[in-house]
């Protein structure tokens, strides 16, 4: 019976050692997974920063050419506004005189389609 008890004790100890080994293996696996996840996150962040840098460079190149177009359009607009302002200054008095003449100089006339009954 003592040998049976000793055999059971050996089995229990072996089971305990096996459980410890399984526990250690799980811990190692979790550490490896955590490390792999951190490395993947770092790689993703590095890739994202690289792509963002490339995007900003392309955006700056596109907006740089757009900025020169914008300044050209603004310059042309100022020139046209200057020309229109000059036309306004030249023709203001004449247009005002014509407008006042149409409003104030009324000549009553009978319409050509009006018939006098008689």
From Swiss-Prot:
Main location: membrane
A GO CC term attached to the entry: proton-transporting V-type ATPase complex
InterPro entries hit by this protein: V-ATPase_G
Subcellular location: Apical cell membrane
Residues modified to N-acetylalanine: 2
Superkingdom as given in the UniProt entry: Eukaryota
Subunit structure: V-ATPase is a heteromultimeric enzyme made up of two complexes: the ATP-hydrolytic V1 complex and the proton translocation V0 complex. The V1 complex consists of three catalytic AB heterodimers that form a heterohexamer, three peripheral stalks each consisting of EG heterodimers, one central rotor including subunits D and F, and the regulatory subunits C and H. The proton translocation complex V0 consists of the proton transport subunit a, a ring of proteolipid subunits c9c'', rotary subunit d, subunits e and f, and the accessory subunits ATP6AP1/Ac45 and ATP6AP2/PRR.
Record's function text: Subunit of the V1 complex of vacuolar(H+)-ATPase (V-ATPase), a multisubunit enzyme composed of a peripheral complex (V1) that hydrolyzes ATP and a membrane integral complex (V0) that translocates protons. V-ATPase is responsible for acidifying and maintaining the pH of intracellular compartments and in some cell types, is targeted to the plasma membrane, where it is responsible for acidifying the extracellular environment.
Record-given protein name: V-type proton ATPase subunit G 1
Native source organism of the sequence: Mus musculus (Mouse)
